[in-house]
């Protein structure tokens, strides 16, 4: 039996979100409310694709169409919003034997691809999967250029206490965190205003480095407003009653991710080390088994993250383009053209 692909509409939001919750690859950003936020702030058209075998759902694949002049571009996730991963999320395949699982997976993916080609006919397609999406062969078998990318996770299922957790870090953060315990600082879960403040701090840091920010305050606060309470959670470190730094965490119940934040602080308090440690303690308190330090692809940044002794996980970026778009991208690389179209072609991850 073939896989039938349809587009979920807003009336099916609850059903879609149940699929997200059931899928090992489902993330905060797969939720229907989050997808609508991505649509609102990317200027893209959203297609939440659902694959069915008969009446049984086998997977979801949210994609976004962007148009620049004569070109149609498809992204999952859309670029320039700081979203680390999206892509396909599979349903009810873990209990299948390997042969049947691979067959169902491939048919679902190729049916979605057929829908995309028939309805959008893009010249360029770019997908970044979640690290739970372990088999990227369907992309490679359908003419995508597939590349591995990396992120860091810290397993916390054994629920270490504060000192046990510190003891797992390298020498430098162990010393810094222990030495800071007599300082008058606090780390607390914040509110919407703190979400906006942390986001603006990240934006300011990008601009100080002459880099283009990949998110906006309006986008992140809309996510905070629309997703279930506690899904987007600001963690704020204050010293003597004044905000110093903070992280924006996302929480799916089985994984907490440090998504945004951690702008450099010029002071003698190890503020970012402390707020990261408290983020992990927050995960332990909520009985969440994984804390993710999103992104392990930039050497300068990994040097800082690695001192918390994380484990690496692999996810995949997959790109497919027509000959004309390959020529345009090659021209961009050679000339460093900063046009709006070409700046979208290679989403960057930390």
Where are these regions (language model features)?
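A general structural signal for short secondary-structure boundary/capping elements
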Residues: 172-175, 198-201, 233, 282, ...
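Structured helix-beta-strand junction loops
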Residues: 22, 119, 183, 230, ...
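Acyl-donor binding region in acyl/amide transferases
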Residues: 69-144, 253-310
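A conserved beta-strand-loop-helix scaffold within acyl/acetyltransferase catalytic domains
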Residues: 3-70, 130-151, 157-159, 164-268
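Active-site/acyl-donor-binding loops of N-acyltransferases
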Residues: 65, 132, 140-163, 286-350
